Amino acid sequence: DVRFLYAVNLLPIIGINFVTWKFTDRCFGQNHKTNLYVIFFSFLFLPQFFFLAFAYGIIPGLFFMLLAFFFLDKYFESGKWKDMLLCILFVMSAVILKGNNIIGAIAIAILCFLRILKERSWKLILLAVCVMAVSILPGKAFHAWYDNEAGGVLCGGKPKILWIAMGTEPYYNNAAGWYNGCSDWLFSEAKYDPEKATELGKAKIRDNIY
């Protein structure tokens, strides 16, 4: 029952608010009034609860990515291996749940390299490399496993440019950039050939913009 997934989504939403409070507590020196404001407004932000129905890994993925940033901050302060390993683990979990979270992994890697300018440490380089590795390798491992189970090389799916093309479509019944099926029919029109679909996507973007 998909409604079970909606209920499960509630837990990471509460977790997101909890991590936000912990971040605030660290940044503002355990300021009680500030903490109360953050807790109050976090739960008052009702749109996050509307995403209960988005059972696509968005909510738990965001929760794990926030935990990754939290333990990154703790690692910068403590230099402990435990905090580094937890940061890496939560990055991997976030990206597995939602591939878009690789953006957060890239941000963590950039923060590590910026930190190197202040603190010369090979552990920071190791952290940056590990974060990027766990963001990329699990996806490749899953694809290899799927290929092995299928007994052949599976199609890589819709090219990402089709989603960009859909985002540039003039909106009708939905808001601009919302899902409207454009990526599906472009892929179908290309007979599910990723290369042909890429060219159709580029042409659609040109038509929409110019």
Task: Show where each model-derived region lies.
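Specific aromatic-rich, kink-prone transmembrane helix
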Residues: 19, 60-77, 87-91, 108
